[in-house]
Amino acid sequence: MAGRRYPIIAAALMMVIGVVSTVAADGGGIASLAAPATCWEQAARRYQVNPYLLVAIAEVESGLRPGAIGRNTNGSIDIGLMQINSLWLPELQRHGIAPRDLLDPCVSVHVGAWVLAQKMRLHGNTWTAVGAYNAGSAVLRERYARKVIEALARREQR
């Protein structure tokens, strides 16, 4: 099964490289999104994640809606542009971030980048890490990563 995943990962990686090249060539492409371009860029730089990957995650998570609230079957709540899960709140509150702060697009982008960086430290710079941003099980991680890849592809076509 592991051998089967490499072509998928290679194709997805080429797609991301194409998206980054295309967006960089058209002047950045993230300036008109739900948060100012500087928020995406600063968060990406601070947590060493790709800003276009952050945008794709936000698109999948909230449809780029800063005020989005999602309720989960386990009783947790997802808050804001990056749909930060309420299970993160105890840790965030230790850093002075309250639930209402997550409705601020810039705060949400920074926290989302921090969460993604945590997942990348755990799983490496992989699609598994991207999937872990949203899901715990391997099957759901893979499904979520595919959605993010599709969001990146849609952005490339714009």
PLM feature spans:
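Detector for methionine-enriched segments
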Residues: 1, 14-15, 82, 120
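Domain-scale selection of a single, long terminal region
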Residues: 20-25
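Catalytic glycan-binding domains that act on GlcNAc-containing polysaccharides
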Residues: 26-158
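Bacterial N-terminal signal peptides that target proteins for export
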Residues: 1-10
